[in-house]
Structures are given as structure tokens and as C-alpha cells.
Amino acid sequence: MQNLTGPTPFPTDFSAQEANGLPSFSDGDIIRRPQLLEYANSWPAEVDEASLLPWLDSYFKRLSPIVPVLSHIAVYEAMLLGRHRSDRDLGAMILSMCSIVMIQAVYTEEAAHLDERTKTAKLWMQHSARMRSTWDFGQDPTIETILTSFFLFGCLFSNGQQRAAWHQLRLAVDMSCQIGLDQPDVYLLKTKQEREQRIRIYLSLAVTERYGFHIQN
């Protein structure tokens, strides 16, 4: 019998025959994998930042007054500095922000274009999910990671995909607990602006989670 070294939640006893039957990777495969990972997490080449700006404007005009969890100045500044291209959490959040405003914040006179908007939003959601699909996703969540799941929840819920939506909401809630949004002592170490943002996020998640529990039961 062969035993795996290190902690694992899975059975660790394998016979030699089972071990020999496992797939192997050549040196070339191992060398290429980091490059593939870097590509997978990069900003999508087919998404032009200029096409996102009107939707970011719409987000801050239509949704931000309802869920005031982001500073429009901070988001625009980050985009102008190109941070969304090097910070996959920020890039994924921006794409999810634009997606939710395309699907949810629809005025009556815009309803005729909803199908086209939904198609584009789904593409951006796919890019958003791809940007943060790393092997260690969830190990070190950020505010951007939490909000991405929160926005994806809204997109999926509006699209009638409730099970996937609740999964994203649970992710957002779990990650918010990981960084201590439910622990008052953590707020003492933050600036006034950070405290206010985190409190708004925590309240938004708590209210949404309670609403979700109510309609599911």
C-alpha cells in the first residue's frame, strides 16, 4: 500500500496497481500549465473597456443608490490605471457589475433590447467567472471577490437560474465571514471609508440572504 503525505480529507490508501494506473504528465505539460493559467485569468481581449463605461455609468445611476457598496470614483480610477487588467478580482467584479445592470436595471423603453442585452451579459458573466477560476479560489477572498459573487447572484436570479444564484449568494456570504465582516472587532482596524463600505456590504448580504431564505421556505 502507498500512503499520501500531508493532511487530506480523502482516503489515503492506494495499492501500487492503482497508483501505476494514474495519468502522468510530461515535463512539457508541466511547463505549459502556468502559461495556460496566466492566460485563463487575463482580461478578455474581445471586451473593449470603452464599451463597459456606459454600463458602469448606468450601474452607479440605477443600482448604486439601492445597494451603495462601491465608490464610483474608486472604480473609475482603477480602470483608468488599468488595474482591472492585472488584478483578476477587480476585473471579474467590473464585468459582473456591467452584467447585472444590463439584466436587472431595465427601463420600460429599453425592454425591446432585453434579449440582446441578456446575451451580452451572459458572455461577460462567463468572462467574469473565468477570470477568477484559479485552483486556490476562495483561499484569500477580497471585497471584489465577494461583490462579484453578489452581482452574479443577481444576474442568475434575474435569468431564472435560482439554484446557481443561491450558490453564488452562499459563496458571497461565506467569503464575507472569512474576512471578518461579521466580526465587530475587525472594523476597528479599518479606516472610516473602509468601515462604511464593509458595513454596507454586510447589511446587503444579510438582507438578501434573509429574503432568499424566506422565499425558499
Label the model's feature ranges:
Residues H72-L90, T145-I146, F153, L169, ...:
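Intrinsically disordered, low-complexity acidic/Ser/Thr-rich segments used as protein-protein interaction/activation
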Residues R32-I146, F150-Q161:
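C-terminal transcriptional activation/regulatory domains of eukaryotic transcription factors
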Residues M1-N20:
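Intrinsically disordered, low-complexity transactivation/modulatory regions
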Residues N20-Q35, V173-S176:
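Short, compositionally biased low-complexity segments
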Residues M1-L4, T120, N217:
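Short intrinsically disordered, low-complexity coil segments enriched in acidic
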Residues E18-F25, N41, I73:
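Low-complexity, intrinsically disordered regulatory regions of large metazoan proteins
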